[in-house]
Structures are given as structure tokens and as C-alpha cells.
Amino acid sequence: QGWGPRIRKEYDYCSPEDYYQGSIVALLKKNDKWLDIGCGRDIFPNNKRLAKVLTSRAKETVGVDPSPNVNNNELLDRAYLGFTDKVEEENYYNLITLRMVAEHVADPDELVRHIERVSASGGHVIVHTIYKWSPVPIITKLTPFWAHHAPKRFFWDTEERDTFPVEYKMNTRTELNNIFLKHGFENISFVYLDDCRALAKYKFSLHTELLIRKFLNFFNLYYPELCILAVYKKP
């Protein structure tokens, strides 16, 4: 265990990614068919061990992504290169996940229409994304795309091939509920999660973020940087 997890434990803090992974652990049943939309090279980039456990639990794990990165995802049984309209199966998947994908979607109605088409009755959809009115999304929305990679590389060591244009058309509770309920889904849960990872590269800055969060939470306030974790169910 490195210094990052130790510091987060000291402040009783779990990252949004932890909650996202936990929601999959809770909802993915043995022999379920799992579709990961926008999965890229890794299902869980920072927890490959858990990703391997969960893909072993599923009967089939399928990925779809317009980036050729998906062809390098070793845990997938099958992969579709393209958007969700490329997915051939209908009424098939028991679990559909979108990890940090919603912010890139240019046509939410088209996306959710295909999610409804490919999801099985009683199936769940988990959306993990950034909240539109957090500082980072506001800054990225106001700056040109060519300027996005440098700060991501500095703060999170992100590779340029993992930086994509952003839209932020389904990044609030209202936007997500409107589009999913329109296509017949039921909202099972929705939470905002404090995201104290912007400065997690350094010990001092991580301590600072978590101290600010602790202070704000004492007054029942959120940390400024927020993520969304929403779960929807098809009747």
C-alpha cells in the first residue's frame, strides 16, 4: 500500500472510482452479460486485479469504443470498434457501464436509445462521470482542445491518446434523468461524490485537498470538484 491510499484512509476518504467499482461488484451477477461503453484499454486502469475478478464472474464481457485503444483491452471477450450503434445484440446485456464517458457524448439521445435497445429486461446501467459545474469541466469547456492534454499529463500522467473532446451534455442530475427516463429507464440511485484527486500526485497537495473537503463536509457542503454516480434500471 503506497502513501496515497494511506493518506486517504487517514481522512476516511474513498474516491469516486472506488464507489464506481463497488457498484459493479454489487450489481454484476454470475453469468451476467456485461457491456462496457468507452472502455478503452482498461476496464479499471488502477485496479486491474478487481477487473480480472469481475470479468471472470461475468458470462461475457464486451467493450465498445470509437478509439482503437479498445483493441488492446485484454480482458474483453469481444470488442466493437465504433459507437453503440455498432453493437449487434438486442435485449441482451444485464449490466452496461459508462466510466468517464458521458462527458464526451455529442448525442445523448442516440446513445441512450441504443443502450435501451441492447439492454436486457431488468438490466442495470451505471453512469460514472464528472459533474458539469465543477471547476475542471468549466475550464476545459472554455479552453481549446489542444490545450487539454498538458494539464492532464502534469496532474495525472495521462497519455495523449487518452485525451478526447468534451461535450458535457449529460453531466447533471436533470440531464441524465431526462434522457434515461425518456427511454423508459428507472433511476435507482444518484449520488454526488467529492473528487479529491486533482492534486493527488503530491503528498502535501493531497493532504490539502482532503483537509478542505473535511472542513466543507463538516458544514454539510460538497467539495468543489464533484463526480456523479447514477444507476438506472430497464423495466
Please state what every model-predicted region is.
Residues T84-D85, E89, V101, F164-E167:
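Residues marking the start of alpha-helices
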Residues R41, P68-V70, H104, P108, ...:
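Glycine-rich nucleotide phosphate-binding loop and flanking beta-alpha elements
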Residues Q1-L95, D195, L210, P224-I228:
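Conserved N-terminal segment of class I S-adenosyl-L-methionine
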Residues L95-V101:
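A short beta-strand submotif of the Rossmann-like class I SAM-dependent methyltransferase core
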Residues Q1, K234-P235:
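Short, Lys/Arg-enriched, disordered terminal segments
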Residues A106-V118, H124-K233:
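S-adenosyl-L-methionine-dependent methyltransferase catalytic module, highlighting the catalytic core
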